[in-house]
């Protein structure tokens, strides 16, 4: 096994098949992929977005940016609870920790407690982003990965198996990269994660792997050291 502890960044859109809401079938399908990775023995932390419930850039037009971001943070907590439920239905012990304190439904984010959960072979899902407006869930993923000592950030995609020179769904000439440096991603303006998140990973030397989570065996393959997707380092 190549990695002992990883952070998996998920899009909220993985929890639905029609673009909006939380669908049990889609959530269960995602949970099964995660369980297969968990069964390898890897310590697994997760950060999930909220694109299935709230798009601040679109729905928050005319709204104060901080307010729109807080709504997005609450939506990530809803997604975290749905994913926790799906994982526990498969027998995977899972804890949700949130950057915004909602003690009735989840633990507050406490780094040492998160580390303890990982050591006890529990999956930890971090909800609420960083807890601050103006920061994306990509940045939350980079931040939490560094805090818990993850060896890599796994950026899950759907139907895109890595980083391409252009959108492969629109441009059949687009070329997939096997490896990129952080600076290449920034200088080319490649849509991997936002600039703040990439810079955080670059300064810490934290590698990123971009891959298709619904490609059978992809997530397990990365953990076991196979060359899957695009490595950014």
Curated annotation (Swiss-Prot):
Disulfides per UniProt: none
One BP annotation, GO: UDP biosynthetic process
Pathway recorded for this protein: Pyrimidine metabolism; CTP biosynthesis via de novo pathway; UDP from UMP (UMPK route): step 1/1
Residues engaged in binding ATP: 9-12, 51, 55, 158, 164, 167
Subcellular location field: Cytoplasm
NCBIfam families (UniProt xref): pyrH_bact
Protein name in the entry: Uridylate kinase
């Amino acid at each position: 096994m190549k990695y002992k502890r990883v952070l998996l960044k998920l899009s909220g859109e993985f929890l639905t098949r029609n673009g909006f809401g939380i669908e049990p079938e889609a959530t269960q399908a995602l949970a099964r992929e995660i369980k297969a990775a968990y069964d390898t023995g890897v310590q697994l932390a997760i950060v999930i977005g909220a694109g299935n419930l709230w798009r601040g850039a679109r729905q928050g037009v005319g709204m104060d940016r901080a307010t729109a971001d807080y709504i997005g943070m609450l939506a990530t907590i809803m997604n975290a609870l749905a994913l926790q439920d799906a994982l526990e239905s498969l027998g995977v012990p899972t804890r949700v920790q949130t950057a915004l304190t909602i003690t009735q439904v989840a633990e507050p984010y406490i780094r040492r407690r998160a580390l303890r959960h990982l050591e006890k072979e529990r999956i930890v899902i971090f909800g609420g982003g960083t807890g601050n407006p103006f920061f994306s869930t990509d940045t939350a993923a980079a931040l939490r990965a560094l805090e818990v000592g993850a060896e890599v950030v796994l950026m899950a995609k759907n139907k895109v198996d890595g980083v391409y020179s252009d959108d492969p769904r629109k441009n059949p000439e687009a070329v997939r990269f096997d490896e990129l440096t952080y600076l290449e991603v920034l200088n080319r303006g490649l849509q991997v994660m936002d600039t703040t998140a990439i810079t955080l990973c670059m300064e810490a030397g934290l590698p990123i792997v971009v891959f298709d989570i619904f490609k059978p065996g992809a997530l397990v393959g990365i953990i076991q050291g196979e060359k899957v997707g695009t490595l950014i380092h």
